[in-house]
């Protein structure tokens, strides 16, 4: 959890927002996936948000569903994902690493065992996408026992009660939804969300990172200007992987590098 605190403190001093890319572990294969993640970090990513392949990702649109399918086609398992996480942590000791999960994967070997494994490989946070705040107690308690930040989604229609719960239970960062629905770069994020950001700050919530539909530098800049601590982009990045992974892996890495570089540059406002 301290890695998030350190990151946000450093970014505040530099007057920057965080840019956080999302990719699915093992997409389109383990070796390529590790190269992709190295490229994202080298291009300026401040933290990572990583998915573990899942057969029914309810919160995700077709782009990230396809990423899951590519990882499954490559035979990637949760065990291999944890091996990848250990390698990423060893190579990049200071970057915050977050997982975006679904509850079935957490339940597989028991909730406590899952978070213990996360701690062992150097994960900093876990967002369980299909567990609402009011049902989160066993997850967040296990997370805190193992020094993992429990992350909560703040929807655009959050009422005061929910905002207070998110502020009370969340650690690391708060995932602020640009809009309701599923992920997807084609579903543009409705920017900005001043009122929610102000309320989250008033209730001393973990810093807000805006996600869903973030696909251009202009949106990153707008999120930071609205008071968010940064932005998360997934589908736009996964689109680059989908477009190039079969035909031109080198072109894919070059495009990813320039995309992340531009998105990070936009966080400096």
Swiss-Prot record:
Q: Its annotated pathway?
A: Amino-acid biosynthesis; L-tryptophan biosynthesis; L-tryptophan from chorismate: step 5/5
> Where are the disulfide bridges?
none
Source domain of life is: Bacteria
Keywords from the UniProt entry = Amino-acid biosynthesis, Aromatic amino acid biosynthesis, Lyase, Tryptophan biosynthesis
The EC number(s) this enzyme carries = 4.2.1.20
Pfam families per record: Trp_syntA
Q: Which InterPro entries match?
A: Aldolase_TIM (IPR013785), RibuloseP-bd_barrel (IPR011060), Trp_synthase_alpha_AS (IPR018204), Trp_synthase_suA (IPR002028)
Q: Which catalytic reaction applies to this protein?
A: (1S,2R)-1-C-(indol-3-yl)glycerol 3-phosphate + L-serine = D-glyceraldehyde 3-phosphate + L-tryptophan + H2O
The catalytic residues are: 49 (proton acceptor), 60 (proton acceptor)
Query: Which terms does the record give in the GO molecular function aspect?
Result: tryptophan synthase activity
Q: Can you quote a single GO CC term?
A: cytosol
What does the record note on quaternary structure? Tetramer of two alpha and two beta chains.
- Which family, according to UniProt? Belongs to the TrpA family.
- Function in brief: The alpha subunit is responsible for the aldol cleavage of indoleglycerol phosphate to indole and glyceraldehyde 3-phosphate.
Q: What protein name does the entry list? A: Tryptophan synthase alpha chain
Organism field = Salmonella arizonae (strain ATCC BAA-731 / CDC346-86 / RSK2980)
Q: What is the lineage of its organism?
A: Bacteria, Pseudomonadati, Pseudomonadota, Gammaproteobacteria, Enterobacterales
């Amino acid at each position: 959890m301290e890695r998030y605190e350190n990151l946000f403190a450093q970014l505040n001093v530099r007057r920057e927002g965080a840019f956080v890319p999302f990719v699915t572990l093992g997409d389109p294969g383990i070796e390529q996936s590790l190269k992709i993640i190295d490229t994202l970090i080298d291009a300026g990513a401040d933290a990572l948000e990583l998915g573990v392949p899942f057969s029914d990702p309810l919160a995700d649109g077709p782009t990230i569903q396809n990423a899951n399918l590519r990882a499954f086609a490559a035979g990637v398992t949760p065990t291999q994902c944890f091996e990848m996480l250990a390698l990423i942590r060893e190579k990049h000791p200071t970057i915050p690493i977050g997982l975006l999960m679904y509850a079935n994967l957490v339940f597989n070997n028991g909730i406590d065992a899952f978070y213990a494994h996360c701690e062992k490989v150097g994960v900093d946070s876990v967002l369980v996408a299909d567990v609402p705040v009011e049902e989160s107690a066993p997850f967040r308690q296990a997370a805190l026992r193992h020094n993992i930040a429990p992350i909560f989604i703040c929807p655009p229609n959050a009422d005061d009660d929910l905002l207070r719960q998110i502020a009370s239970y969340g650690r690391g960062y708060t995932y602020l939804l640009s809009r309701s629905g599923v992920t997807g770069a084609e579903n543009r994020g409705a920017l900005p969300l001043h009122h929610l950001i102000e309320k989250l700050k008033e209730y001393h919530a973990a810093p807000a990172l805006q996600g869903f539909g973030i696909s251009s530098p202009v949106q990153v800049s707008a999120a930071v200007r609205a008071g968010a601590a940064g932005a998360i982009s997934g589908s736009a990045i996964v689109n680059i992987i989908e477009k190039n992974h079969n035909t031109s892996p080198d072109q894919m890495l070059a495009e990813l590098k320039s995309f992340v570089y531009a998105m990070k540059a936009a966080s400096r406002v």
